[in-house]
Design a protein with these regions (language model features):
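Short Gly/Ser/Thr- and Asp/Glu-enriched loop/turn motifs at secondary-structure junctions
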Residues: 30-32, 64, 73, 114-118
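Catalytic beta-strand/loop module used to bind and position nucleotide/cofactor moieties
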Residues: 76-201
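Well-ordered beta-strand positions
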Residues: 10, 28-29, 70, 114, ...
Length: 214
């Protein structure tokens, strides 16, 4: 069984070609459910195709690596493009961005946040954010999916168990491994989270960063 893998063309798809000074950040909320698979993934191996087709959920293939993710209107996507002369250590860039996200979420009172795996953020041992990175000759492109309030059953409905997983997952199912901010803490307004993250990045990068008004 197969399903069409569309070229990635979601809200942040133009950020690699936009004109900006050094760094551009866009925090956005998906308008509909979608599955986005990594560059090395195949939908047949990672997507629950019957459920995706039944529900009319489109599958997109991104340029960055990593495993497949579900996007819904109950999540926030954090996208950052950066002009580069030399692409350094990707782990350092993941850590820089993810630590700033942790700083912002901590200001909202969310506790027990930490870096996990290659590029995840977790509350305790449960994942709330996964991120991936792509680069071309001129720019790096980081994007992360933050689960604000989505029910994990939705993720389970559209994704099979990943072909690769971080050590800290230890074979756990999506239901056992993933959580949301609202489940672990309390419900926040999406704009409240968006604003505090934009402020933290603006304070850190100053005039180097441009925040997209989306």
């Amino acid at each position: 069984m197969s399903i069409t893998e569309h070229k990635y063309n979601l809200a942040d798809s133009d950020i690699l070609t936009d004109v900006f000074l050094n760094i551009k950040m866009m925090i956005w909320r998906p308008e509909a459910r979608a599955v986005v698979i990594g560059n090395s993934n195949k939908a047949v191996n990672t997507v629950d195709i019957p459920n995706a087709e039944k529900d009319g959920v489109s599958v997109y293939k991104r340029n960055s690596g990593g495993e497949s993710v579900v996007l819904t209107e109950n999540m926030l996507i954090i996208s950052i493009a950066k002009n580069i002369e030399k692409f350094g250590n990707s782990k350092e860039m993941f850590n820089q961005y993810n630590n700033l996200i942790i700083e912002g979420l901590s200001k909202l009172g969310i506790k027990n946040l930490g870096l996990k795996g290659i590029s995840d953020i977790a509350i305790g041992e449960k994942k709330i954010l996964g991120s991936a990175m792509y680069r071309n000759k001129d720019r790096s492109f980081y994007h992360a999916v933050l689960n604000v309030s989505e029910d994990i059953d939705i993720i389970t409905r559209y994704l099979r168990h990943p072909e690769r997983e971080p050590d800290y997952r230890s074979g756990r199912s999506h239901k056992e491994f993933v959580t949301s901010i609202s489940k672990e803490h309390k419900k926040f307004e999406f704009n409240e989270i968006k604003t505090i993250l934009e402020n933290v990045f603006s304070e850190h990068f100053g005039k180097e960063i441009e925040i997209s008004e989306n």
